[in-house]
Amino acid sequence: MSKKDALSRFLFEKSAVRGELVTVTETYQSILENHHYPEPVQHLLGDLLVATSLLTATLKFDGDITVQLQGDGPVRLVVINGNNEQQMRGVARFSDDVKAGSSLKEMMGNGFMVITITPKKGERYQGIVALDGETIEACIDNYFNQSEQLPTRVFIRTGLQDGKAAGAGMLLQALPASAEHSADETAEHFELLTQLTHTIKAQELFTLDTKEILHRLYHEEDVTLYDPQPIAFHCTCSRKRCEDTLVTLSKEDVAHLLQEQGKIDMECEYCGAHYIFTEEDINNINKLSSSNLH
């Protein structure tokens, strides 16, 4: 039986290091549903989902985070959207040239990872890092190194569990030096914990209870585990958003679409939901829009 998707935070009591563990298997499967992604693209989406969930958990405010991969290779775009409530969705755009076993470089070509953090209150932040690493894990580590934040490492595991897509991961982050823990002590312990965490296997993360995982990795450490936070697939599409988009189109374009198909069928690329608009629907939307302007 698969584990429920959740984020678990933990703290090493005798050192200035914190951690996160996420399981995103059900969310990952929901993102893949209704799409026909080649296997390498599926893995890419899974890795980025795990990474985004871990990044989202580092936010200390209400807001959204978007992690995008953009490149000039067969895979042009991969996007995961998340928020502080761990509601996630994602999509990829690709050509037919994605070959089995393709590496990140072979799929994305020359590209960038763009991380956009949008608080509900306050200014938006955007960080950009070149896709120089061989894996998403390496690219995220590069992002933290370049942004001069606290020492941080991520550990991403995706694959199959019972024949279905599965994903999970961990994050370690050193906390600022204090009277109790010097910077040198923290750096030394952080390196030790990093080496221990590297040994975690995908199947262990996919199947074992969080307490069991922490015990296996850090049985000589004093670890405090906090209550888990659910993670779930959640799409923000709606009929209202589609209506708002239709209002921005010219009347000629809308009339042309109606003449061609007799209706306008708008499909969400994230979840596959369809929103159908007839000529009568369009007229009502235009009337409403016109009345709101006066």
Swiss-Prot record:
Q: Name one Pfam family in it.
A: HSP33
List the Gene Ontology MF annotations in alphabetical order.
protein folding chaperone; unfolded protein binding
Where in the chain are disulfide-linked cysteines found? 235-237, 268-271
The principal location of this protein is: cytoplasm
Q: Which GO terms describe its cellular component?
A: cytoplasm
Q: Name one GO biological process term.
A: protein refolding
Q: Which SUPFAM superfamilies match?
A: Hsp33 domain, HSP33 redox switch-like
Q: What keywords is this UniProt entry annotated with?
A: Chaperone, Cytoplasm, Disulfide bond, Redox-active center, Zinc
Q: How is it modified after translation?
A: Under oxidizing conditions two disulfide bonds are formed involving the reactive cysteines. Under reducing conditions zinc is bound to the reactive cysteines and the protein is inactive.
User: What subcellular locations does the record give?
Assistant: Cytoplasm
Q: Which family does it belong to?
A: Belongs to the HSP33 family.
The protein's name: 33 kDa chaperonin
UniProt source species? Proteus mirabilis (strain HI4320)
